[in-house]
Amino acid sequence: MTFEGHACAFGAGTIINAIATWKGAAFGVDLKTFAEVSLFEGKSGIKGSIEGTPEGDTRLIEHCVELVLERFGLELEGTIITGSEIPLAGGLKSSSAAANASVLATLRAVGEILPPLEIVKLGVRAAKEVGVTVTGAFDDACASFLGGIVVTDNRKMELVRREEADSKVLIFAPSKKAFSADTNVKRSRLIAPYVEMAYELALKGEYERAMTLNGFLYCGALGFDTEYMLKALECGVTGVSLSGTGPSYAALVKAEQVKELKSAWESCGMEGKVIETSINNRDAISFKGRGSLE
């Protein structure tokens, strides 16, 4: 007998990177990751594959399936395949989206239900245990799974606030990759008192100011160019940041700012692509699309 499950989760952009203080904020973006799980009776383990990235690291998605099976005391073997619109290792929460989609697809395969935050926490645990994240990225995982803007305390694994927002999002995704687990935590911790100030702004709902302050702080600490942020400010954008630990930049923009900022970023000369999307407010459970894995 074969048990099959499909799910989708969304990417996210950074408002406050939690590495410095363990407190973060993020927003969902309308870029999707799909997961397809097939399970059978047996004990030979879980084998994962990432569509379009044959050499990709599959430990996270495999471990997500394993944790769900362990949670319900099931001994099954099988496969998990993921496919994504989110650039890998670009600071756009590809790992959080993959973990969320993998956990949800496995739950659907075995016919079980868990509360949304418990699903998120299983994915965060998997990410920590395989070492793809520094803080567990609970903020990113919440934004990916729940949609909207979220503010979190990652150490306590607590969702402090969530609200929906309507905005276009412009992302510059350089061709080079930067894996979160490789980031310079020591330098990030030096800026903690100032990141705390940005977090206070986010708690007050001043997300764009919080995001921009976060961006300048982390660009300085991690050695990324601030030119992309300054170009956005020149275009009248008020919310722009390095996303995650880079190398992507994300800006919350009005429809009339899209064209100008796109051309400003393209003129900066770094190899990469500009992605136009919007804030996603839908949660992963209610979204039934399967997209690229159909």
Swiss-Prot record:
It is found in: Cytoplasm. Its EC number is 2.7.1.71. GO terms for biological process: amino acid biosynthetic process; aromatic amino acid family biosynthetic process; chorismate biosynthetic process. It is an enzyme of class 2 (transferase). Keywords: Amino-acid biosynthesis, Aromatic amino acid biosynthesis, ATP-binding, Cytoplasm, Kinase, Nucleotide-binding, Transferase. HAMAP family: Shik_kinase_arch. ATP binds at P87, L88, A89, G90, G91, L92, K93, S94, S95, S96, A97. Belongs to the GHMP kinase family. Archaeal shikimate kinase subfamily. GO terms for cellular component: cytoplasm. Its main location: cytoplasm. It comes from Methanosarcina acetivorans (strain ATCC 35395 / DSM 2834 / JCM 12185 / C2A). InterPro entries: GHMP_kinase_C_dom, GHMP_kinase_C_sf, GHMP_kinase_N_dom, Ribosomal_Su5_D2-typ_SF, Ribsml_uS5_D2-typ_fold_subgr, SK_arc. It holds the Pfam family GHMP_kinases_N. Pathway: Metabolic intermediate biosynthesis; chorismate biosynthesis; chorismate from D-erythrose 4-phosphate and phosphoenolpyruvate: step 5/7. This is Shikimate kinase. GO terms for molecular function: ATP binding; shikimate kinase activity. It catalyses: shikimate + ATP = 3-phosphoshikimate + ADP + H(+).
